[in-house]
Regions:
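Signal peptide processing junction and immediate N-terminal pro/mature segment
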Residues: 19-23
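Positively charged n-region of N-terminal signal peptides that target proteins for export
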Residues: 1-5
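Bacterial N-terminal signal peptides
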Residues: 7-18
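Acidic, serine/threonine-rich low-complexity disordered tracts
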Residues: 24-234
Length: 234
């Protein structure tokens, strides 16, 4: 089932007529927030990790593939291209490519973003949706490790890593239980759990390449293209 275009068309209206669409509407498809443990993210080029995430409230799971790609200096800032691929049941896979500043705690401010819904051409995300109260792309929830509990040796898919069981907390006071390892870039998270979600690694490695296919168009041209495609089906 193709990702519905109604929320995206609604976004176009909201940009032109802000009162037309409520702030609660989701506009950019396939976006999920991520918990990142401060000081554990590694910007290793080509590194990738594949996770299964359980949404406890909905009792639904989805898969997320995170990868670190090439570096780029943007307006004098050291930045890195990252990609997040989200695959949800009965929905089109969505790849989000973001250019974020590199900080010691992980990805910082977003500078650019490109989104591609499976079966469609990619589009550039307007800056409006990269920062501030309207941010929809690349949301991260930093958590600070407050206690290291025990050291563990873990094996998965023939790979053996050394890890720590830790307790962490977000700025909003959300508690995070996690198993972390420096041998598992880029997230360095083997498993993490909050009251809302549980994240478990499936596999990880090196050699990641971009999954965006084709040159991105502007968001408004992309909207027009999709409307034309829908009209041609009728």
């Amino acid at each position: 089932m193709k990702t519905k275009l109604i929320p995206i068309i609604a976004l176009a209206a909201s940009l032109c007529l802000p009162a037309a669409v409520s702030a609660a509407e989701k506009a950019i498809p396939g976006q999920q927030s991520m918990v990142i443990l401060e000081g554990n993210f590694q910007f290793i080029p080509g590194s990738w990790a594949d996770y299964t995430i359980l949404d406890k409230a909905k009792n639904e799971t989805y898969r997320m593939l995170m990868s670190v790609l090439e570096q780029e200096n943007y307006k004098g800032l050291p930045c890195r291209w990252l990609e997040i691929e989200v695959a949800m049941k009965d929905q089109s896979t969505v790849v989000t490519r973001i250019l974020a500043t590199e900080t010691k705690n992980g990805p910082g401010d977003l500078q650019k973003a490109v989104v591609q819904v499976e079966g469609y051409s990619p589009f550039s995300v307007p800056r409006k949706f990269l920062q501030g109260k309207d941010q929809e792309v690349g949301k991260v929830e930093p958590a600070r490790v407050v206690k290291r509990l025990e050291r563990k040796t873990l094996s998965r898919l023939g790979k053996t890593i050394q890890a720590w069981v830790v307790e962490a907390q977000t700025a909003q006071g959300k508690n995070v239980s996690a198993v972390v390892s420096e041998e598992l870039p880029p997230f360095c998270i083997y498993q993490a759990e909050t009251e809302d979600t549980r994240l478990t690694v499936n596999d990880w490695g090196l050699g990641a390449l971009t999954r965006i296919k084709g040159e991105p168009t502007s968001f408004f041209l992309w909207i027009i293209e999709q409307i034309g495609r829908e009209l041609n089906k009728k």
